[in-house]
Design a protein with these regions (language model features):
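Phosphate-binding chemistry for phosphorylated carbohydrates and sugar-nucleotides
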Residues: 1-158, 171
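Catalytic-core signal marking the mid-to-C-terminal active-site face
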Residues: 155-251
Length: 251
């Protein structure tokens, strides 16, 4: 068995997710390095999400954990067909999954949509970057502990560190900018915004993605750009966000 050191495990009814867990993993990062631990595991308040921290203090997100679970299934000789991510799943995850010989599909953001697509395709593995992972061959919903145990079992079986295990997946730099909406218009229909998106996609030349989507909970447009060149990605995201902001103010 493993020696386990727990932190953030003193609930008082008010401190759920307060500076701890998968939504605030900074303290876990520090503790892993201080203790010289092999890894750290962070759950959110209701336990359906999980992130990990490797021995160097690097955060391992839901995309990387889902990739490891897919690898573990293949190493056990299981036929899983494919993996479902979302519109926000890192492009590096998609490429890594396909390199394993698996299909990959994207659902809308939200675990309910991941589950719907899994059922549609008859697959068993899907999840979000936030660490909400669904393994229908193990449980019927997202369960952080179940997901974590599968990763830990795979690391033990392969006798490999978490850091080395995720080395097979190269995450693309990703920039997200939230642009507040001012009125009732739709900036995404603006000709200037659409032109900025087209120009960005041309510069990425098939090795990146541009995504604009309205927030489901706030009056925001989320601008996401990812690609191989971090400086270019940042520049393109800011250019598009500026056009969205201009269009929002004019609406």
């Amino acid at each position: 068995g493993a020696e386990v050191i727990t932190i953030g495990d003193k609930p008082d009814g008010l401190n759920i997710n307060l500076d701890c867990g998968s939504t605030h993993p900074e303290h876990l990062v520090t503790r892993v390095k201080v203790e010289g631990a092999d890894l750290g595991v962070a759950f959110d308040g209701d336990g359906d999400r999980v992130l990990m921290v490797d021995h160097q203090g690097e955060i391992v997100d839901g995309d990387e954990l889902l990739y490891l679970i897919a690898r573990s299934r293949l190493s056990d000789g299981e036929d899983i067909g494919g993996v479902v991510g979302t519109l926000m799943t890192n492009l590096g995850m998609e490429l890594a999954v396909k390199s394993l010989g698996l299909d990959f599909a994207r659902s809308k953001v939200g675990d309910r949509y991941v589950l719907e697509m899994l059922n549609e395709k008859g697959w068993t593995l899907g999840g979000e970057s936030s660490g909400h992972i669904i393994c229908l061959d193990r449980t019927t919903t997202g369960d952080g502990i179940v997901s974590a145990l599968q990763v830990l079992a795979y690391l033990a079986k392969e006798n490999i560190s978490l850091h080395d295990a995720v080395g097979g997946m190269n995450k693309f730099p990703q920039v997200m900018i939230n642009v507040p909406l001012q009125g009732s218009g739709d900036p995404m229909q603006s000709a200037a915004v659409q032109q900025a998106v087209e120009q960005a996609e041309a510069k990425l030349d098939g090795r990146g993605r541009v995504l604009l989507r309205p927030s489901g909970t706030e009056p925001l447009i989320r601008v996401m750009v990812e690609g191989e060149d971090e400086l270019l990605v940042s520049q393109l995201a800011n250019d598009i966000a500026a056009q969205v902001e201009n269009a929002a103010q004019a609406a």
